[in-house]
Every structure is written in C-alpha cells, then in structure tokens.
Regions:
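C-terminal helical subdomain
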Residues: 172-175, 179-184, 195-255
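Conserved glycine-rich cofactor-binding loop
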Residues: 11-13
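Rossmann-fold cofactor-recognition segment
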Residues: 49-64
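Catalytic Tyr-X3-Lys loop
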Residues: 97-116, 131, 135, 159
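Amphipathic alpha-helical dimer-interface segment in Rossmann-like NAD(P)H-dependent oxidoreductases
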Residues: 110-128, 168
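Conserved mid-core segment of classical short-chain dehydrogenase/reductases
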Residues: 68, 88-105, 148-151
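Catalytic loop of short-chain dehydrogenase/reductase
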Residues: 89, 133-158, 164, 168-171, ...
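Conserved glycine-rich Rossmann-like NAD(P)H-binding loop of the short-chain dehydrogenase/reductase
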Residues: 27-41
Length: 255
C-alpha cells in the first residue's frame, strides 16, 4: 500500500500543487474539495499523466461526519502519513454590523472546527504508527486582526492556537503539526482569481506576478510544504510565514 497525502481543500492553487509534489515523490494524493468535480478530476488526471497516483473526493467539510467518513475511506487506500488542511475561511471585509452570526459561525466551522475534527480523525492512527504530519495553511489574520475581519481573524486565530495545542500534546508521540502563515497574495485562480474576477486577477498578475515574482507561486510553495513534512524530528518547523520577496512582512505594515 502506498503512503497517502490527504489534502482537504484541493484547488488549482496551493492544494493542487502540494498534491502534485507529493505524488511525484511516491505518495498517493487524495484530493478533496467541496465543489467543481470537473476541476477536481483535472487535478487527478494531471497527476496520473505524470506517472503519479491520485484520487478525487467531493467533501463538504462543514457537514457532520463527512471528514470522519473520508478519513476512514482514504485509510483503505494506504496509511495517511501527511495531511494538508487547506480550507480557507475568508468572507471578505465586513463591518461588525454586517457580519451575521451565521456568517461568523461558518468561518469558525471551516477554519477551526474542521481542523479539530480532522485531527481527531487522523491522529490516533498516526500516533499508533509513531509518525505523521499535519500541514495547516493559515493566513495573516491568524496573527493580526484588522477592521472588517471579525469572522476571519477570530477563526484563524483559533486555528493557530489549535495547532499549538496539538503540538504540545502529540509532538513527543511523533506527530508533527505545522502552521503555515500565507502572508501575501497567491497566484491561484481558484481563490484570488474568483475573489477579484478574471479581469482584475489578470491585471494583478501582469503588474505583480509572472516575471515580477510578486505573487506567491503555488508550485514554489509546495516545495516548502514538502520540505516541512520530511524534516528530522530534532529540527521540526512548527510555524513559519511565506511571502513574496517584494512584500512587507505583516509586522511592518502601518496600522
């Protein structure tokens, strides 16, 4: 049985690129997303055309029992050695008045509760095997709250603290949890492209991306994710931030 890299939130950006990287290095990539079955199949086909193995799984991570059922199914393919929790929880800038309770709760369900449920599902087997890695994509909002980010900042801050508590309990048992702060815009059509719209996204790519290297490239980010998952336990990375060379770090931005 092949070792498995399970990706929760596999789009044509970070998730898909990480899946391709792991599949190219001997893992079966189990790719999961909520919608766009056709896009998911394209990711699977791309991996297989390059000699890797992959499977696509439609997943509504907010639905009770869905994550737990998925983990059981994927463990039948092979041992889940690496998990990437790549669900976003960005709802855009909204004032407190315009942030409904349901909207606030949805951000928490995706960013924090989803990770909790995933950890509960995968860690027992990882602990029993004495090894396993949980990679968690996060955002600047995890370390800095801004106006209009009531749902997102609270959810991502919770995600960060959950990563710390998981490490405190399970690092000594061989389970490595890494909180990866994406501190910048990612050149990803499935996320930033949809938020901005096709025309604005392409304009941004022309001015900051491409040869300018001012947008985070998912394929290059995947190299970092892969490296973290294969670190020696004497020098594990538990948290880091990724940004393009031309971006100011989050702590240097004026309030």
């Amino acid at each position: 049985m092949k070792k498995v890299c399970l990706i929760i939130g596999a789009g044509a950006g970070i998730g898909g690129s990480v899946g391709a990287k792991f599949a190219a290095n001997g893992y079966h990539a189990a790719l999961c997303r909520r919608s766009d079955a056709e896009g998911l199949q394209k990711l699977v086909d791309g991996i297989e055309s390059n000699g890797g193995t992959a499977s696509g799984h439609m997943l509504n991570a907010v639905e009770e029992g869905a994550i737990e059922k998925l983990v059981e199914e994927v463990e039948q393919i092979g041992p889940i050695e690496v998990v990437l929790f790549n669900l976003g929880a960005q709802i855009g800038n909204r004032s407190l008045e315009s942030t409904a309770l349901k909207t606030f709760e949805l951000g928490w369900q995706m960013a924090c509760k989803g990770l909790f449920r995933l950890a509960k599902a995968v860690i027992p087997a990882m602990e029993a095997r004495g090894k396993g890695t949980i990679l968690v994509t996060s955002a600047t909002a995890a370390v800095r709250g801004n106006a209009g980010q009531h749902s997102h900042a609270a959810a991502m801050g919770g995600r960060r603290m959950l990563c710390q508590t998981l490490n405190a309990e399970y690092a000594s048992k061989g389970v490595h949890v890494a909180h990866i702060i994406v501190d910048g815009a990612v050149d990803a059509p499935d996320t930033l492209g949809k938020m901005l719209g096709a025309e604005m996204f392409e304009k941004l790519r022309e001015t900051r991306g491409k040869e300018h290297d001012g947008l985070l490239l998912p394929t290059e980010m995947a190299e970092t994710y892969f490296h973290i998952a294969h670190q020696h336990r004497s020098a594990w990375t538990h948290e880091l931030d990724l940004r393009a060379h031309s971006d100011l770090a989050w702590w240097n931005h004026a309030p």
